[in-house]
Amino acid sequence: MYKRIFVGLDGSPSARLALNEAIRIAAASGGEVTCAYVVEHRPQLVDVDAGFPAERDGDVAAVDAATPVLDYAKSVLELQHVPGTVRALDAYGEDVAAVLMRTAAEADADLIVMGTSGRHGLRRLLLGSVAESLLRAADRPVLLVRHDEPVAAAKAR
């Protein structure tokens, strides 16, 4: 049974389902959960005459996005009485899947749990998939928890 479970979070509905599944497994096995949110610092064009505040603002926004997600994960872990930790990780241009895999290895995780959406066709091709990249390169078991987009929302896009 899995005792050290690592879950990647991004604030999406599928990530919440993945968190719930990781907690369920940890509760059944007497294990613990490590939750991680990767903060991506995307390159931005900067007006040299204006200085660099826009870039810093983008970094602050990226870090701020992680806070409610990790706070939610911490509260769910506490509510379910499952031991765990939450972490924000900086990617700084590195592939998100690589950051997650490295951190899971550092945590000596038995299992990586990730959410994945039910995107198809061009949307999936354009957006890519961190979960798929991680699955292809992982050196330990990976559980993908799928969240299908509602049909009406998918058609509207």
What annotation goes with each model-predicted range?
Residues 75-112, 150-157:
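Structural beta-alpha unit
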Residues 18, 45-48, 96-99, 124-125, ...:
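Short, well-ordered secondary-structure micro-motifs
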Residues 3-55, 76-85:
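Small/aliphatic-rich secondary-structure junction motif
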Residues 140-152:
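Short, flexible loop segments at boundaries between secondary-structure elements
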Residues 38-68, 103, 151-157:
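Acidic, proline/glycine-rich short linear motifs
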